[in-house]
Amino acid sequence: MSTHIIVQARMNSSRLPGKVLKEVLGKTLLEYQLERLKRVINTGKIIVATTIYPIDDPIVALCNRLSVSTYRGSESDVLSRYAEASILFLSQTVVRITADCPLIDPMLIDRTIDFYRRCSFDYVSTDHATYPRGMDVEVFSTDMLQMANSNTMQPTDREHVTPYFYQNPDRFSIGTYSEDLQASHYRLTVDTPEDFQLIQILLENLYPKNHKFNLEDILKCLQKNPQWSYVNQHIVQKII
C-alpha cells in the first residue's frame, strides 16, 4: 500500500510571512520538519505541496537540495493541490501534515497510521483535546480525497482540505486517535512571532543534545520550564 506524506507549505502566510524558512541554529523550520518526517516508518514518499507562485521558489529549492519531492498547485484551493499531488505520486493513502508543525513527532504519525489501518476508518485525525496544536496528523484515502475534490465547492472545504470528511459523518466513518495524555493547552504550531519564539527556545534546548527528540521530551522540557509556554499562551487558534 502506497502511503505518502503530503505537506502543505507556502511563504505567503498572513500572520507570519516566510515562517517555514525562518531559521533556528542555522536550519529552517521546514528542514527540521522534513528531518523528522523522514523517520516515519509506515510511509513511502514525502511530498511538499506548495504553490505555483515565484514567492515559493525557495521552498522548492530547499526540497530539491534535501531530495524531497514537490508539487506545485493552486494557492487558495489547497484541496485541489492535495488531490492533484496524490494522483501524480500514485498515493493510495495520504497523511496530511502542515508545514506550521515543525516539531511533529514521527512516532505519533506512525501510531496514527497504524490506528487508521487497524480500525478501517475512512478518516482519522489526532485528538485536539489530547495533543498540543502542532501535533496534528490526518490520514485518509486518495479515493476520499478525489471524492471531496469532485463534490464540494465550499470555500472552507477547498482551503482547509478535510472539513468535507468530518462534516459528513453520515457518509464517512470518522476516527480520532488519542492517548492517555493531557497536553492540549500547549501550542507547538507556528502561526505568529510568539509561536516561533517558543519553537526557537525548544529547538535551542533540545536539538543539540538529541536530534531525535520526541513529544515526550518536549513535554518534559515544558513541565520543567513552565515559563516558556507563557510566550504564546494567549494566541487563539483560528476557527475553521
Per-region residue spans from a language model:
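Conserved donor-nucleotide/metal-binding helix-loop-beta segment in metal-dependent transferases, i.e.
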Residues: 84, 105-130
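Conserved nucleotide-sugar donor-binding
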Residues: 91-92, 136-149, 193-197
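Basic phosphate/pyrophosphate-binding loop/patch that engages nucleotide-derived ligands
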Residues: 88, 111-122, 141-157, 167
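Short beta-strand-to-loop acidic/aromatic patch adjacent to the donor-nucleotide binding site
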Residues: 86, 90-101
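Conserved donor nucleotide-binding strand/loop of the catalytic core
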Residues: 64-77, 87
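Conserved alpha/beta core of the MobA/IspD/sugar-nucleotide pyrophosphorylase nucleotidyltransferase superfamily
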Residues: 140, 159-240
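Acidic donor-binding segment of Leloir-type glycosyltransferases
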Residues: 38-70
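N-terminal glycine-rich phosphate-binding loop and ensuing alpha1 helix
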Residues: 2-49
